[in-house]
Amino acid sequence: MPAPIRLRELIRTIRTARTQAEEREMIQKECAAIRSSFREEDNTYRCRNVAKLLYMHMLGYPAHFGQLECLKLIASQKFTDKRIGYLGAMLLLDERQDVHLLMTNCIKNDLNHSTQFVQGLALCTLGCMGSSEMCRDLAGEVEKLLKTSNSYLRKKAALCAVHVIRKVPELMEMFLPATKNLLNEKNHGVLHTSVVLLTEMCERSPDMLAHFRKLVPQLVRILKNLIMSGYSPEHDVSGISDPFLQVRILRLLRILGRNDDDSSEAMNDILAQVATNTETSKNVGNAILYETVLTIMDIKSESGLRVLAINILGRFLLNNDKNIRYVALTSLLKTVQTDHNAVQRHRSTIVDCLKDLDVSIKRRAMELSFALVNGNNIRGMMKELLYFLDSCEPEFKADCASGIFLAAEKYAPSKRWHIDTIMRVLTTAGSYVRDDAVPNLIQLITNSVEMHAYTVQRLYKAILGDYSQQPLVQVAAWCIGEYGDLLVSGQCEEEEPIQVTEDEVLDILESVLISNMSTSVTRGYALTAIMKLSTRFTCTVNRIKKVVSIYGSSIDVELQQRAVEYNALFKKYDHMRSALLERMPVMEKVTTNGPSEIVQTNGETEPAPLETKPPPSGPQPTSQANDLLDLLGGNDITPVIPTAPTSKPASAGGELLDLLGDITLTGAPAAAPTPASVPQISQPPFLLDGLSSQPLFNDIAPGIPSITAYSKNGLKIEFTFERSNTNPSVTVITIQASNSTELDMTDFVFQAAVPKTFQLQLLSPSSSVVPAFNTGTITQVIKVLNPQKQQLRMRIKLTYNHKGSAMQDLAEVNNFPPQSWQ
């Protein structure tokens, strides 16, 4: 058989291929020749053939038939054969294949070889793809090589020990004596790998962490020698001595100093020295400074040192490198809650980053800007953020609008400013706001009695001839329906009043009804507003009757139903019309803050009080409001029955802000109303017994498929179902919340509501934190009683904190499998 071609010739031949098919033909031809050579047990050219096979593997072609040949090369006595054999083993084998176990004896022999380069090959292979069984068998040889005087072997053995610890953590103590001595080595390679080994051991074992804290002075001394040493061509990178080792030591110091006063105090001086003496003209210096900042912020450092670290991040914001600006913004966002005042000094620079062309920097700057808002700077920050909202890309508008809403609600200096700000957002980015923006603004307007005339006049002018922003049109329609008499009378004292007639007001609402841009929900708002004006206007009642009667034959079923009901109100119940359509009472907002929630003031000296009038004394009557909700189709709700009463009261109508909906949300068990604040509800037996028994049913009906109820912004909610064969009216729904983003979602609260014909019980969740990268889930159980076997519908509300912002979203679940309710 002729000698096979060399690797270099094969590469040259493959590169001449003009098409993918031609390349595949060449590869297949060569693979056939290599297979033939392997079958003939050709030892002369085995090394050359395996090398060519590895090149084909790098190109993406299958090369698994060369695995056993790699083992034969490893067993060879020639160094060139061993080198290719070990390389092939690292590329073609892994611990999922049993073939790799055949290497154990060869690696053990090579670890005891007389040549350091053969020992190095064995260490590299074990550290790259050694399984837990191999690591357990060969850990003794690795520990022996850690104690050798050969620096070449010690650095490789240290990295191999890291792999052994990851695979078999219980072997960690075996390497403890040898690891201490590694820090006395002068060789930088050994120092670097020893720091990596120490870091791995400290991260995996609290006992090791406490044990190695006594090494902090020695690590500080090594770092100081690196900083103070003169020029060394062997380790110098852009004028800095071994920056890789410096970064590794700083990272280890961060782990050792976390939550430990003595260790933190021992490293304060050296951290200050690194922060002040490191050259920033090169990227290498910036890398060391960044690691220094992370260490300072993570340990119990002095306040002056923390200010120095934040000032370094502030200088990073002025750097021309976008990567440096991005990591600075990310680091400031992590530290803003603990060192808010120091970060506030760089507010103007952070706001300037909103104008950056890079979308990643722009998003981080937006998140950090919202974190800096407090009662002292709310006006200036909102001005900048509103300007940003007006000019930013569409993908930013939803998050920016939500952040402005939350900040305005928390820090608004006055009700008028609050209303103006939200109206500005709705005018600028109304199509991007969350679903709860409309009811929240309606509630705010309702509670601001002195601002009714001003608000309705502003909204009337805002929608003249422009119906593109549907949430704004919905709020305007609601306000015109409630306060249309104030608009016509021109009683506004806040700004120059406008002269509007009753017919002009109705013209606007009729235009909303017939506009092609109006959604079904918006038309519902407009029709209800026209109906309410029948009790506020005196000269246009007949026109209102005519409009309402026209929509009694609308193709929109929801609109038609409302029009028919309103027609019946005119004809049969006209004597009740004034009472049913009277002005909405003040709406109390339910807060869901748990007892352990920490109230953040974002660095303000005193909380900014909102300019409010004292609430009316005495309980508010609710019978008329309930009648109105019944008329509008919003009184068919069943509340969640709490698992245990709490001390937090909740108003009956606080969350029912969208009067056109037929389902509202109710609190989770943590925010359930006390027995004194809600009527007693007759509870079926399944809601009282066996709440903690597992499994929930002993006789489970099989075959109910699970569904994905919600999937948005990295958060996924899945429903799984169980039903009892003996009590088929009961459905147990287990929710599982998972998080695919890079950061945890904290303060997670899941709430649910069902129509009145159902009974619903929401049990306590397993946790309030949804781990990142889908590393865990939150589970929560819902019990639903459906005695009438009606199709199950549910509205869910999700609230959580993510990336420093409070998130909230509503969703309807209508895709329940028939097996779950029939």
Curated annotation (Swiss-Prot):
Q: Which UniProt keywords apply?
A: Coated pit, Cytoplasm, Cytoplasmic vesicle, Golgi apparatus, Membrane, Protein transport, Transport
According to the entry, every stretch annotated as the GAE domain falls at 702-817
Q: Where is this region: Disordered?
A: 593-627
Q: Which InterPro entries match?
A: Adaptor_Complx_Large_Subunit, AP1_complex_gsu, ARM-like, ARM-type_fold, Clathrin/coatomer_adapt-like_N, Clathrin_a/b/g-adaptin_app_Ig, Clathrin_app_Ig-like_sf, GAE_dom
Which stretches does UniProt call biased (Polar residues)?
Answer: 593-604
Signal peptide per UniProt: none
Name where it's found: Golgi apparatus; Cytoplasmic vesicle, Clathrin-coated vesicle membrane; Cytoplasm; Cytoplasm, Perinuclear region
The family annotation for this protein states:
Belongs to the adaptor complexes large subunit family.
What is the name listed in the Swiss-Prot or TrEMBL entry for this protein? AP-1 complex subunit gamma-1
Q: Which organism is it from?
A: Mus musculus
